[in-house]
């Protein structure tokens, strides 16, 4: 089976969104369609944020996608790639499609001086965990934490008064 791996642009929004929703449902990731669509639009129109790719058969049928965004981390010497999504439709898995995507993404990063690629795997997704480990990813001894930025009035903490002894 011949598979192509090509960069996406704004014209790919509809197909990519369909694949992203399929991936989020498969991996049990909660989502709001409007939020995904808005974020995807931003990514596809602003390549300084990252890059999306489409995985297609030789008949131009979309069978998966990948999204790499950029993060800055001193620990890794500057810009690192964050592989936020890599999805291959079920009937095309175990055929080297994911490996092709990772190979191309690693080349993309190397060409841009990005020395590290980070990703997250859902605890229940054992096949993804096994796949990524087999390609050289390693588990860090850390927890992932996130904070959704809230409006000022909904914050549980109040701003400390400058000059006060804590």
Residue ranges and their predicted role:
Residues 7-14, 18-78, 84, 102, ...:
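Acetyl-CoA-dependent GNAT
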Residues 79, 95, 112-115:
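Short coil/turn segments at alpha/beta junctions that flank glycine-rich nucleotide-binding fingerprints
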Residues 119-128, 146-150:
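Conserved beta-strand-loop-alpha-helix junction that forms the acyl-donor binding cleft
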Residues 71, 89, 122:
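Residue-level recognition of the GNAT/N-acetyltransferase active site
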Residues 133-142:
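Conserved acetyl-CoA-binding loop of GNAT-fold acetyltransferases
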Residues 102, 109-120:
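Conserved GNAT acetyl-CoA-binding A-motif
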Residues 88, 94-107, 130-134:
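Conserved acetyl-CoA-binding loop-helix of GNAT-fold acetyltransferases
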């Amino acid at each position: 089976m011949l598979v192509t791996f090509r960069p996406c642009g704004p014209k790919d929004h509809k197909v990519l969104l369909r694949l992203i929703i399929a991936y989020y449902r498969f991996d049990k990731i909660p989502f709001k369609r409007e939020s995904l669509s808005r974020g995807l639009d931003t990514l596809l129109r602003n390549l300084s944020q990252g890059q999306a790719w489409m995985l297609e058969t030789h008949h131009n049928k979309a069978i998966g996608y990948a999204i790499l965004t950029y993060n800055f981390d001193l620990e890794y010497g500057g810009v690192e790639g964050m592989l936020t999504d890599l999805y291959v439709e079920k009937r095309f898995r175990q055929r080297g499609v994911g490996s092709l995507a990772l190979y191309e993404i690693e080349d993309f990063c190397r060409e841009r001086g990005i020395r590290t690629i980070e990703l997250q795997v859902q605890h229940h997704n054992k096949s993804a965990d096994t796949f990524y480990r087999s390609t050289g990813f390693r588990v860090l001894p850390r927890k992932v934490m996130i904070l959704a930025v809230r409006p000022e009035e909904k914050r549980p903490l109040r701003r400390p008064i400058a000059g006060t002894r804590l």
